[in-house]
From Swiss-Prot:
InterPro entries: Longin-like_dom_sf, Sedlin, TRAPPC2L. Pfam families: Sedlin_N. May play a role in vesicular transport from endoplasmic reticulum to Golgi. Keywords: Cytoplasm, Endoplasmic reticulum, ER-Golgi transport, Golgi apparatus, Transport. Belongs to the TRAPP small subunits family. Sedlin subfamily. One of its GO terms (cellular component) is perinuclear region of cytoplasm. It comes from Taeniopygia guttata (Zebra finch). GO terms for biological process: endoplasmic reticulum to Golgi vesicle-mediated transport. This is Trafficking protein particle complex subunit 2-like protein. It is found in: Cytoplasm, Perinuclear region; Endoplasmic reticulum; Golgi apparatus. CDD domains: TRAPPC2L (cd14854).
């Protein structure tokens, strides 16, 4: 099950972080921020190939004992990080990929909103409902 979903700005500050067990919220914030180093390494390793590539899914960033951390980066260098419970072995890579695409589409809808200033924290009921449905879908 997905326990945390985060949207991180190009400058590496959080635009949106949602975690399911709220008592471990600080732990998930730490996990998301430590994963940004791995995201930056993967982006720099891809170099110019990332610009030409349409698939922006970074895959498994790193596993821990309890969780697996996955990453995705947009063309505008906004990063999506998803922390998944490692006990969920039924979750496949293509399902994670489609969840990131759905998250990216919802983020694009927010960016198209004329009342949203790019770089501000995301406060959207529609985005919250989409994230909640994704977290429940994975359960």
């Amino acid at each position: 099950m997905a326990v945390c979903i985060a949207v991180i700005a190009k400058e590496n500050y959080p635009l949106y972080i949602r975690s399911v067990p709220t008592e471990n919220e600080l732990k998930f914030h730490y996990t998301v921020h430590t994963s940004l180093d791995v995201v930056d390494e993967k982006i720099s390793a891809m170099g110019k190939a990332l610009v030409d590539q349409r698939e922006l899914y970074l895959g498994l960033l790193y596993p821990t004992e309890d969780y697996k951390v996955y990453g995705y980066v947009t063309n505008s260098k906004v990063k999506f990080v998803m922390v998944v419970d490692s006990s969920n072995t039924a979750l496949r890579d293509n399902e994670i990929r489609s969840m990131f695409r759905k998250l990216h589409n919802s983020y694009t809808d927010i960016m198209c909103n004329p009342f949203y200033n790019p770089g501000d924290r995301i406060h959207s009921r529609a985005f919250d409902t989409m994230v909640n449905s994704m977290m429940m879908q994975v359960c």
